[in-house]
Amino acid sequence: MALAATAGCLGLSWLIWLAGGLLTLLTTGRWQEVPVVQAPVLLVRLIAHPNVPLEAWPPLIRRSLPGPGATGAWLVVLTALGGVAISWLAWHRSDVRRSRGVPGLRRGPGGTSSRSAGARRFRLSVRLDRGVASGSVSKARGWAHPRDLRPLRVSKAPGDRIVLGTHAGRLLAAEPRHSVMVVGPTQSGKTSGLAIPAILEWSGPLLATSVKADLLHATLEWRRSLGEVQYYDPTGSVGPVAGGSRASGWSPLARAATWPGARRIASALCSVARAGDGGMEDAGFWYANAEKLLAPLLFAAATTGASMADVVRWLDEEETNEVLLALELAGVPEALRAARASLGREERQRASIYATAETVVAGFADPAVSASAESCEIDPAALVGGSAGSLFCCAPAREQERLAPVFTAIVREVLDAAFERAAATGRPLDPPLLVVLDEAASVAPLADLDRVVATAAGHGVQLVTVWQDLAQVESRYGGRWATVVNNHRAKLVCSGIADPVTLQHVSGLLGEEERAEHSWTVGDDGRHSRTEAVTVRALAPPGWLRQLPPGEAVLVYGSFPPARIALRPFFDDRELASRAASGSDR
């Protein structure tokens, strides 16, 4: 009796699983991602929530289903129809076997399938879980099953790993300090579904750049409950901030009081141009010479108490006397020689170098930015010194190009401080530093991002970069763009991308799959026949990738099979929404 009851429950749970799959197929055109082994779990959840049948399914599928009432009605109808269909097939099969006395499958001569006149044909396409590795066809295992992603599963956000989303109702997190790349157009959930949750769940120090005020406003109070929070917003783009906090000042002159420091900060300011030249040697020449000119100017200003406004004036007016006098008083021959080499160039060449240097410090020509450089409260060494402090850099969208050298220099300083501390202690930062570079191609484009991504983990830096599409990466880094992409261990591709470069590249990464095409023929005399053919096609064609439903993403992670996952908008998660709302409950 108990065995019969168990079998009945299993049969009912399987019918409910089948009905859910048919319903998602009807509403989205795709089969559900819930494994059949979880069918009993669906039955238990339905019993626990009889009035809210949607709660039985994971969020990824729940969003694709109709309302609770419609879902319940459809489940009842489809479950009943499934039961009737299975009963009819079982009866029909037993009836045919009784009448023929032979198995239902019949093969013709040579192993080919036979088909009688007036026969009915049914076709089914089934994906095979074996790869293809012949010719130019890449080996592919198809979409990941839950068991394939077991090493990435976590029961809750760890605090030192980036939660990527959910798969089959389970959280997936990147391995510790493995770099994450997020690609998607505006409104695809990059910020709300990954960047903000990552910041709210991180327990160590943080550096975040963004053009969106909501990233700061949603995380500021919670991060303040963990440690000191600073934000750099020289143009006041984020508006009033909770708690009446004021923006912190930053000046490159704070690091230019020594000649090595001046050379370093000049290199950081000019690096954004090197990142954007796409490998053009001519542009590299002019920016290298602009860096050589800027270093002694910054050193002269820092050692005489001058300001960045003075540096801008020296460049605009091609001032030489003040600069040379300051450098002579500083008593560093190398700095004086560098200045004289730049100032003594042929007139047309010198004019071009000055013009290039002017574009690098153009942001400080803005009175608001210049005023914010009168003080320097941002201390990169303190940020990576073991606390859970936070530094937000907020760039207005309309000023990205002009302010990019400033933001890049700040990010470069923090990364240098992190790498130096790791080298001094002989071990990675503990706790690790989270660096979130939103709009990584334009706000703070690091010239050596490919190397930073490759080495950050070993120094205790968790890197998250956010992009509109891969065309941005290609435009910014030229021939190195594929290396930038490949050095990220985790790559998340969000919905709505229309860029051909992104679609083709990701489709190629996912590879191809084998599909078995089955055809069944049922003759008038009750005889059955079957044929099978194997076809190879792209696992995720570009058109399919473009039509990913909102809130979903494709995860490409190391050597794991690719997976379709659901993002976690912070406002849909109770714990994250609570942290974003108050930041008071730890």
What do these predicted ranges mean?
Residues 11-15, 19-20, 24, 171, ...:
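P-loop NTPase motor domains
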Residues 14-17, 31, 57, 74, ...:
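A residue-identity detector for tryptophan
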Residues 49-53, 63-65, 258, 319, ...:
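Short, solvent-exposed helix-helix connector turns and helix-capping sites enriched
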Residues 109-157, 258-269, 311-314, 380, ...:
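Short alpha-helical interface patches
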Residues 138-170, 289-316, 481-483, 490:
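Solvent-exposed, charged interface segments at domain starts and junctions
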